[in-house]
Design a protein with these regions (language model features):
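A detector of single, family-specific signature residues
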Residues: 1-166
Length: 166
């Protein structure tokens, strides 16, 4: 029984080492591709190489979008409008259409940025306190929408992020 357990453990350890090496190879490949692309997004605290590469890959050419709202709609970070006459619903859901991979990268990047950047942290905290229902999810989606505005402007102007004073 011990031989079987030892053999299974050695196979598992060898598999983990092989996977670790593959991760290193993939990280190097991402870095090589990022050298070609301007590092505008990695200048934002909390956005590393993986999020930056993912966002840029999913957006593609930023010049095909006229406004940040178009990027947000492409990512699916917009809400349904429920209205009839003068009535407009207070609670509405985010649309399910859009590029789900871009939405994932933007939401995860927003979650990371809110931890590293004080302006995004304040914005997240403000949105968190506004409602009682779905607080984190809503605040994170709105923070991601704020991040879309920043990403759009940085990529469009091809410049680095400079955090505001204060």
């Amino acid at each position: 029984v011990n031989d079987t357990v030892n053999q299974a453990m050695s196979v598992s350890i060898a598999s983990m080492r092989a996977l670790k090496e593959q991760v290193k190879v993939l990280d190097k490949a991402i870095e090589q591709h990022l050298e070609i692309i301007p590092n505008t997004l990695t200048s934002i605290p909390g956005i590393g190489k993986v999020y930056s590469a993912g966002i840029i890959a999913e957006i593609g050419d930023i010049h095909r979008f006229n406004a940040q709202a178009s990027v947000a709609k492409f990512a699916g970070l917009v809400w349904h409008r429920n209205q009839s006459g003068d009535f407009e619903a207070e609670h509405s859901q985010m649309i399910k259409s859009g590029n789900r991979y871009l939405r994932y990268y933007l939401l995860e990047a927003a979650n990371s940025v809110r931890r590293c950047d004080s302006e995004f942290r304040r914005y997240y905290d403000l949105k968190l306190k506004e409602v009682n229902k779905y607080q984190h999810k809503r605040a994170l989606a709105l923070t991601a929408r704020k991040l879309v505005r920043l990403v759009f402007r940085l990529l469009k102007d091809n410049r680095l992020y400079i955090p505001p004073e204060g």
